[in-house]
């Protein structure tokens, strides 16, 4: 294929929703030329995602946007479950912040999208084209050519080294690739309503598990509130979305239903589906284009952001010539099984929490009632330990070195040598890092191995016990440029007590790629050289 320089980029992203815009921000951070093509001329404001978790906020922290996004987020929102008689039978409010952020947070998708899109202005090498639609796709071993219809109806070709399809559950790109979205579509529909000025002092997400009309009530930012009501098969979905019907549904939960302002309403069908492939040649699917989940554990968007975190650095490394092209294929092997596991969990929760069977509701209430008296089970539920965490045994990991490998590393606060308190990721930087627990990681490397990690762009960080004085001494005496920080909350000490080896290779997505001691670093480095591009000039370009 011949490249047209006027319409050519390293990565083309199809779709500028939260996943596509997040991907563009990370690629911008990594210096990758990126063009985002979005069909809609404006941000869509009908009811969509509202839940964002600690892993997602950690990703936005890497992108330099967590604080700005947090201005529109209610953090640490509990999840409460109510019986048909109004009794609360479960109050889920996770207190742990192992990744540096609260586990349950509420936002409004259109506000986040605006922040993410505005942030792209930071990067002159990233452009957003709205009102443009991808209508065709061809690819070969060298690049991908997209046929794009512009807002004026004219078509042009856009050549890219790689394409990321973030174009939603009905993904045209997925259809063009002939990839099947396997799974089920649930027969029941739900009417989703966003309202304003509802007089309801209930600062939580409430699951009203009444088999007569299961529904969800969500406390949203800026005096908004969302209700989601089950629509029964005999009911007309258009009629139930009318204002008078909506007020009748909400009336049992508020004092003055006529006072509320109905902002928007839409009927949804839930899906439990996973694409048979996440990667096809030089095209990768992310978010709803790759998997669709019911909303019961609030992980639909968060699963998409895990895709973003996993794929962005791999694309950047390949395009920038530091990583071998084969690492892109590890995106599917690392992400697909976990995405499916989250969907299965959502299906289970939906069946348990929102049954229309009175018998199932009774058995659920009995089980959760008994769980209160079993401390281990109670903690498992209330701290959301039921959420399966990704654990990679294949991909960009060196297995066999530690049970921490393939899992996300914790993120406590640490203190720098000048006394500043910072989150660990802000010290590690947005790329690879090698952590040394109570040792300088560079001192544990041979000259050749140090040169390899330096060429890869890794940052070297030494973490020491709080108030040990080591950071000050190391800053004065070290022969290397490793950063030294103190473990002020003793969190890293606890982590290394569980995972004893003192050297950890951390990937840009904060997953542990390897853990070993000084004697094992040569082997880890050799294993990583298989993931690296043999020469910078071997980077694949159109």
Swiss-Prot record:
Cofactor: FAD
One MF annotation (Gene Ontology) recorded for this entry: FAD binding
Function, as annotated: Catalyzes the insertion of one atom of molecular oxygen into position 2 of the phenyl ring of 3-(3-hydroxyphenyl)propionate (3-HPP) and hydroxycinnamic acid (3HCI).
EC number(s) reported in the record: 1.14.13.127
Key words, A-Z: Aromatic hydrocarbons catabolism, FAD, Flavoprotein, NAD, Oxidoreductase
Family named by the database record: Belongs to the PheA/TfdB FAD monooxygenase family.
Pfam families tied to this protein: FAD_binding_3 (PF01494)
Catalysed reactions listed for this entry: 3-(3-hydroxyphenyl)propanoate + NADH + O2 + H(+) = 3-(2,3-dihydroxyphenyl)propanoate + NAD(+) + H2O; (2E)-3-(3-hydroxyphenyl)prop-2-enoate + NADH + O2 + H(+) = (2E)-3-(2,3-dihydroxyphenyl)prop-2-enoate + NAD(+) + H2O
Origin: domain of life: Bacteria
Annotated binding of FAD, by residue: 10-39, 278-288
Top enzyme category: oxidoreductase
PANTHER family (UniProt xref): 3-(3-HYDROXY-PHENYL)PROPIONATE/3-HYDROXYCINNAMIC ACID HYDROXYLASE, FAD-BINDING MONOOXYGENASE
NCBIfam families: PRK06183.1-3, PRK06183.1-5
Name of the protein in its database record: 3-(3-hydroxy-phenyl)propionate/3-hydroxycinnamic acid hydroxylase
Species the sequence originates in: Burkholderia cenocepacia (strain HI2424)
Pathway: Aromatic compound metabolism; 3-phenylpropanoate degradation
GO biological process, any: 3-(3-hydroxy)phenylpropionate catabolic process
């Amino acid at each position: 294929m011949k490249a047209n320089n006027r319409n050519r980029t390293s990565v083309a992203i199809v779709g500028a929703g939260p996943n596509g815009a997040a991907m563009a921000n990370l690629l911008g951070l990594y210096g990758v030329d990126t063009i985002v093509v979005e069909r809609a001329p404006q941000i869509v404001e009908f009811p969509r995602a509202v839940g964002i978790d600690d892993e997602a906020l950690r990703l936005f922290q890497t992108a330099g946007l967590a604080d700005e996004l947090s201005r529109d987020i209610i953090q640490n929102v509990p999840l409460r479950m109510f019986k048909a008689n109004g009794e609360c039978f479960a109050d889920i409010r996770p207190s742990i912040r192992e990744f540096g952020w609260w586990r349950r947070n509420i936002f409004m998708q259109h506000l986040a999208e605006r922040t993410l899109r505005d942030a792209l202005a930071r990067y002159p090498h990233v452009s957003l084209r709205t009102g443009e639609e991808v209508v065709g796709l061809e690819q070969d071993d060298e690049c991908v050519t997209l046929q794009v219809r512009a807002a004026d109806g004219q078509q042009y070709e856009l050549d890219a080294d790689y394409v990321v399809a973030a174009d939603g559950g009905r993904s045209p790109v997925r259809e063009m690739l002939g990839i099947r979205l396997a799974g089920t579509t649930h027969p029941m529909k739900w009417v989703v309503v966003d309202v304003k000025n509802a007089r309801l002092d209930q600062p939580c997400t409430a699951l009203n598990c009444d088999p007569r009309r299961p529904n969800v009530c969500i406390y949203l930012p800026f005096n908004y509130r969302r209700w989601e009501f089950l629509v029964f098969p005999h009911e007309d979905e258009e009629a139930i979305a009318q204002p008078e019907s909506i007020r009748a549904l909400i009336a049992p939960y508020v004092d003055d239903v006529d006072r509320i302002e109905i902002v928007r309403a839409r009927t949804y069908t839930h899906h439990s589906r996973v694409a048979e492939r996440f990667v096809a040649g030089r095209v990768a699917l992310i978010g709803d284009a790759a998997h669709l989940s019911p909303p019961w554990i609030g992980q639909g968007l968060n699963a998409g952001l895990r895709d973003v975190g996993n794929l962005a650095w791999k694309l950047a490394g390949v395009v920038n010539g530091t990583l071998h092209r084969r690492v892109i294929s590890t995106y599917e092997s690392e992400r697909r099984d976990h995405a499916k596991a989250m969907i299965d969990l959502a299906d289970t929760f939906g069946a348990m929490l929102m049954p229309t069977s009175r018998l199932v509701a009774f058995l659920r209430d009995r089980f959760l009632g008994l769980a209160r008296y079993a401390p281990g089970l109670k903690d498992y539920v209330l701290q959301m330990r039921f959420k399966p965490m990704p654990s990679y045994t294949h991909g960009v990991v060196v297995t066999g070195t530690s049970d921490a490998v393939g899992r996300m590393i914790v993120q406590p606060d640490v203190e720098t040598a000048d006394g500043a308190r910072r989150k660990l990721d802000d010290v590690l930087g947005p790329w690879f890092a090698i952590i040394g627990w109570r040792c300088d990681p560079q001192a544990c490397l041979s000259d050749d191995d140090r040169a390899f990690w330096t060429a890869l762009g890794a940052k070297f960080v030494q973490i020491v016990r709080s108030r040990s004085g080591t950071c000050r001494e190391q800053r004065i005496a070290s022969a290397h440029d490793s950063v030294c920080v103190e473990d002020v909350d003793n969190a890293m000490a606890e982590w290394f007590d569980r995972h004893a080896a003192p050297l950890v290779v951390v990937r840009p997505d904060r997953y542990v790629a390897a853990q070993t001691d000084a004697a094992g670093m040569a082997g880890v480095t050799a294993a990583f050289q298989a993931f690296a591009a043999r020469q910078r000039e071997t980077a694949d370009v159109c």
